Amino acid sequence: MAWCRATRSPSWQDSGMERVLGIGGYFMRAADPAALGVWYRDCLGLDADENGLWRQGTGPTVFATFESGTGYFGSRAQQTMLNFRVRDLDAMLTQLRAKGADVAAETQDMEGVGRFGWVTDPEGNRIELWQPA
């Protein structure tokens, strides 16, 4: 397997190197894909079409790596975590609780970054909700 050699300097800025433009999709396995799609639509308002295309609003996207032993994602079996930007975290968490979703009791504030809350989907995937600062 060939790996791209990592460098400490952002050499792509000066080299004319092609760059990715953004996240093009997020794909997950599910025991019942249709039901999980309905959950994301009904609980989070994710309006994807029949092909899964969802036109999201503008805003920042975070790409971060974590130590392999992190407990931040919930279950150790979960290798990635989906994060959605939200306008009003408290309103979203209230809405999710009203729909019977598994919402974590705690929230987290990060100065200059925003507020975070978490919900677990019916397949057991922990999802982070982020209200940017």
Residue ranges, per PLM feature:
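Mid-chain, well-packed structural core segment of small domains
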Residues: 75-96
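A generic alpha-helix structural signal
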Residues: 37-40, 93, 97
